[in-house]
C-alpha cells in the first residue's frame, strides 16, 4: 500500500475540541451573564442586557449585562478593598496564584479555544494553537517576575487598581497581556471586555 492510499483510506476520529461542552456551560448559566464584581456575579437586569453573537453565523451565544455607572463604581471599590491584601501576599504569594491560573488555562484550553472561536469568529486552530498557549505563557512569565520583584525591582510599589479595556481581536490573549503584569506587581484589575467579544 502506498502512502497516498493510506491517506485516502484513513479513518479520522472525532476532534478533541467540541462545541457541546461550551454549549452545556452556556446553558448551565441560562446563556445570561451579569457583571463579575468582588468574586460574585451581579443580579441580571433585563433592561441592560445586550446580545453576544457568533460572528460567523449570527447565532445568539448569550445575553450579557452592560455595566451601569454604579456597577463600575462597585467594581472599582471592590478592587480597592482587595488590593492591600493582594499586595501583602508578596511576590511569591502572588506567583502561586498566577501559576495556578496558568495551569487552569492549560487544563481547560480546548474549551476556552472553542469559546474564543465562537465568540470572536477566528479559526479554532488560531485560538487553540496560538492564543491559548500564549495566554498560559504570559501568566507563567509574569508569575516569575512576581517572584523576582523584591530583588530585581526593589522599591517598586503597586499603583493600586488598573482599569483595562480589552479589544475584540485577541480578547483572551489581551486580557493576559494586560492583567498578568498588573496582578504580578500587586495591583488589582477592573476589566472591560469588548462588547463584540465579551464571553
Task: Label the model's feature ranges.
Residues 37, 72, 76, 161, ...:
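Hydrophobic aliphatic residue packing
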Residues 54, 66, 193:
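Conserved strand-loop elements at the edges of beta-sheets that form or border functional pockets
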Amino acid at each position: 500500500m502506498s502512502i497516498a492510499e493510506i491517506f485516502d483510506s484513513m479513518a479520522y476520529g472525532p476532534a478533541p475540541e467540541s462545541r457541546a461542552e461550551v454549549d452545556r456551560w452556556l446553558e448551565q448559566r441560562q446563556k445570561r451573564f451579569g457583571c463579575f464584581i468582588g468574586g460574585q456575579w451581579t443580579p441580571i437586569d433585563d433592561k441592560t442586557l445586550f446580545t453576544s453573537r457568533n460572528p460567523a453565523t449570527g447565532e445568539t451565544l448569550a445575553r450579557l449585562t452592560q455595566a451601569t455607572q454604579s456597577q463600575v463604581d462597585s467594581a472599582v471599590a471592590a478592587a480597592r478593598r482587595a488590593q492591600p491584601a493582594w499586595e501583602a501576599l508578596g511576590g511569591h504569594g502572588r506567583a502561586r496564584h498566577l501559576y495556578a491560573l496558568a495551569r487552569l488555562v492549560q487544563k481547560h484550553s480546548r474549551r476556552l479555544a472553542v469559546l474564543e472561536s465562537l465568540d470572536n469568529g477566528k479559526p479554532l486552530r488560531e485560538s487553540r494553537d496560538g492564543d491559548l498557549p500564549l495566554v498560559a505563557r504570559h501568566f507563567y512569565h509574569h508569575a516569575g517576575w512576581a517572584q523576582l520583584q523584591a530583588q530585581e525591582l526593589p522599591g517598586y510599589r503597586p499603583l493600586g487598581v488598573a482599569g483595562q479595556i480589552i479589544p475584540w481581536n485577541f480578547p483572551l490573549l489581551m486580557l493576559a497581556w494586560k492583567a498578568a503584569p498588573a496582578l504580578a506587581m500587586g495591583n488589582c484589575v477592573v476589566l472591560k471586555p469588548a462588547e463584540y467579544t465579551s464571553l
